Design a protein with these regions (language model features):
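Intracellular juxtamembrane helix-capping segments at the cytosolic ends
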Residues: 1-2, 168-183
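Helix-loop-helix hairpin linking two adjacent transmembrane segments in secondary transporters
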Residues: 1-44
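Small-residue (Gly/Pro/Ala) motifs that create kinks and tight helix-helix packing interfaces
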Residues: 2-12, 87, 119, 202-211
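Multi-pass alpha-helical transporter architecture, strongest
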Residues: 32-40, 222-259, 266-269
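Extracytoplasmic gate region of multi-pass secondary transporters
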Residues: 61-114
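Helix-to-loop junctions at the C-terminal end of transmembrane segments
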Residues: 115-128, 211-212
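C-terminal transmembrane helical hairpin of 12-TM major facilitator-type secondary transporters
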Residues: 126-174
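A late C-terminal transmembrane helix in Major Facilitator Superfamily
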Residues: 182-216, 223
């Protein structure tokens, strides 16, 4: 039996053959990631002979960046998947009209924008780690709320607003947090961004494959599953990030000792 991919467009059902476009974007993203990773810029060529930061591409730094990419892949995928298939879910599960579903989607992106604006002043009084934990807690509460009260219209409105508010600033917060842990070079930043883009491709595909007219409830299952996986990945990111900070401090201490020994050898300089 062929599985249909439902996309809100004049109440038509678009077949799963459109999933091929997602795979095309996937392979293009992988190609771009590999190409940008190995590409050497003129600045890097100039610095090739200089002493590089020994912690820049250490195993610990790579693990931390990989976890950051995973967190953003899950968070960005959940963010886009929720916004893309919210109209479908509201129409199939709670019998929303098309206009009501569009208002609901607008509410989601409105609170998403509000959350980004609120995050700006919060960033001046809270640490990146505290902000990320707070955002995840808000998003998890909203997703559980949507799961438990999935048959109530008012719950969908409230849960959608809270979900948009919570998930809005996870992306910039994770980027800022990662910069605290490692030296965020161009290659590392590219790997994280491409990881987020891959999540934005895979998660909506999963939403489309499992959210059907006959059974739209998997929508809230996926919302909860992805955000809990994101929370788990965040735990390991913070744990490995702490190790990266210790490694960086040790290397800086060794570098200071080396400089002090140089000064003792050449006291006149």
């Amino acid at each position: 039996m062929e599985t249909d991919l439902y996309i809100p467009k004049d109440d038509q059902v678009i077949g799963a053959k459109y999933a091929e476009s997602f795979w095309l974007f996937f392979f293009l993203s992988i190609y771009s990631a590999v190409h940008l990773y190995v590409l050497e810029t003129p600045i890097q060529k100039q610095k090739a002979g200089s002493t590089a930061d020994p912690t820049s591409y250490s195993t610990q730094s790579i693990i931390t960046v990989a976890l950051s990419a995973l967190v953003l892949a899950l968070a960005s995928g959940d963010e886009v998947g929720y916004g893309s298939f919210l109209l479908v879910y509201s129409q199939f599960n709670l019998k929303f009209s098309e206009s009501s579903g569009q208002y609901l989607t607008s509410l989601y992106w409105t609170f998403f924008t509000i959350g980004r604006l609120i995050a700006i002043p919060l960033a001046t009084i809270m640490s990146n780690q505290s902000m990320l934990v707070l955002e995840l807690c808000i998003t998890i509460v909203a997703s559980i709320f949507l799961f438990v009260l999935n048959q109530l219209t008012w719950a969908l409105w409230i849960g959608t607003a809270i979900f948009g508010l919570g998930i809005s600033a996870i992306f910039p917060t994770v980027m800022s947090l990662t910069e605290n842990y490692v030296n965020l070079t161009g290659r590392f930043a590219t790997a994280i961004i491409v990881g987020a883009a891959i999540g934005e491709m895979i998660c909506p595909l999963a939403f489309g494959l499992f959210t059907t007219q006959e059974n739209p409830i998997p929508f809230v299952y996926l919302v909860n599953l992805i955000i809990f996986l994101c929370a788990g990945a965040t735990y390991f990111l913070i744990k490995e990030g702490a190790k990266s900070i210790l490694e960086k401090r040790k290397m800086e201490s060794k570098e200071d000792e080396r400089e002090m020994s140089t000064i003792k050898v050449y006291p006149g300089h």
